[in-house]
Amino acid sequence: FEYLKVDFTSNGMVQADSYYNKDVTTAVEAYNEGFSHFISEVDKGEPMFIALSIAPIFPYQYGNSRRIACDTWGKIGQSEYSLNAVSGGWWTNEFYQYNDPDHLVLVGNDADKETEGENRARITNGAVSGMVLVSDNYSLEDKSGRGDAKLSRERAQKILMNKDVNEMADFGRSARPVYGYREYNDKGDGAENCFVLDTEKYLYVSVVNYKDNQIAGKVALERLGLSPSSFSSVKELWSGDDVKVGKDGLSYTVPGKDAKIYRFLKK
């Protein structure tokens, strides 16, 4: 499909002393009038995906997606920033078709390139948010000097071709934080690191490690709405390994600056 990004739309919600239409007296009225006209013009052409950025949550009916984290690149701190928005705002996917985690960059412009673990974390970020829009320089004859086209192509072959992870992203739904109150840094200003997405066939548990060192933990089955008899198998999607889950819950270990996705096959 074709898409159109409409940026800084919150500026159209600023209250003013007067408006072009003198019958309009509030910012919300002006926003609705302007966007209604915009959408009516867009609808005269081919179907268009409208991606809103730096946009108010309401009114929501003018966009297919709303960017929840802006100017987000590929380092692990950027994934944490984006997933912080999912931690507190996953529910906006209930009315916007997609929560947009920003373009998913594998290799940026810094001399210190992103690790493959950071790449997995960033694409997990997209799958958890329910929207994947990749953004690297993949040129075969690059003359821009931006990024590293050869490395981006190599990483894309490794990271973006995972069928199971892509299938999760294809649901287009935002996962929810497993706990809703447990920030990774215990300071009240960070993202959660465990997210759950429940579908008809599968239940996905994503664990992202924002720290430099390995983390380990356990998620109780009850917390996931599961019982030992409600699933038949568990697979970790990035490695492809089968995982044994006991009655006491899902035990996980995640290397520093990396992510894992556990997929429960429901009975």
Predicted regions and their residues:
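Active-site groove signature of glycoside hydrolases
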Residues: 1-17
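Carbohydrate-binding surface patches
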Residues: 126-129, 134, 183-226, 257
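Solvent-exposed beta-hairpin/edge-strand motifs
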Residues: 222-240
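Extracytoplasmic/secreted cell-surface and envelope-processing proteins
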Residues: 12-18, 59-62, 215
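Glycan-recognition surfaces
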Residues: 29-147
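C-terminal beta-strand-rich structural cap/linker in extracellular carbohydrate-active enzymes
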Residues: 245-267
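Aromatic- and carboxylate-lined catalytic core of secreted/periplasmic carbohydrate-active enzymes
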Residues: 117, 123-185
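Aromatic- and acidic-residue-enriched carbohydrate-binding clefts of CAZyme catalytic domains
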Residues: 12-32, 38
